[in-house]
UniProtKB/Swiss-Prot annotation:
Keywords: Antenna complex, Lyase, Phycobilisome. It comes from the Bacteria. One of its GO terms (cellular component) is phycobilisome. SMART domains: EZ_HEAT. This is Bilin biosynthesis protein RpcE. Belongs to the CpcE/RpcE/PecE family. Pfam families: HEAT_2 (PF13646), HEAT_PBS (PF03130).
Amino acid sequence: MQNPSAENSQPPLTEEQVIENLRQTEDFSDQYYAAWWLGRMRSRHPESLPLLLAALAPLHDNPIHDERRAVALNAIRALGILQARSAEEDLRSLLKNNDYSVREESARSLGMIQAKAAVQDLCELLSGAPDELEQAQSGSAKLKEPYESVLEALGSIGVASSSVITIIKPFTKHSRPLIRASALRALLLLTGEQAWAPPLIELLQHDDPLIRRGALLDLGATGWMPALPAIKAATVENSLKLVALRGLAEKSDDTTVLDAMDALL
């Protein structure tokens, strides 16, 4: 399928046209784009949520149609962006889906919705013996569960119970740096304890630029103001620094963040 963000020579679609494209079931490319568009444009059309929820139904088919699966994944993402509380029950059920990507996107969207009822479901995905948490799936680099998105979701939801903190802590020692970063981000958000920040800042010095980028965005998401100098000095693209700084600005009235953003423009 064509990338939804790809430019083309066609005139822009209206919201009504997009709704009709998602409603019809013959052209999967139109459905795929429509599901993406409704999230991207923060649609408040009364039919947006019902149609996006209906697009999830094929995920329960066995076998699942590949193109319907792609539409459903875009619908999951859109429901998160739209913070659709009416989708919580459906998204929670999808955390038990056999498809890794479905679980990953559902966890991420539940975090965006801040679905407190999903905390126990998310914690169950983090359970397991230490060796299980490190073990990759057969023939794949993927681990047993999408730990990054689950950890980030728990941080975003904000339930700082002792049981949640306890289940997150082991992931700060995980062998994969981005999983460590997600755990540190979650703990910094949930506890406000500065002890979780230095290991996250250290990842800004990692040799792998992907890890530096991930750590930068995680720091920004925490809103932890003392991270400002490290974010400014990070060897990362200015466009990503702006995203991280915006995260700080959204949680602070300190004008030095805005000054740092202006300096990058």
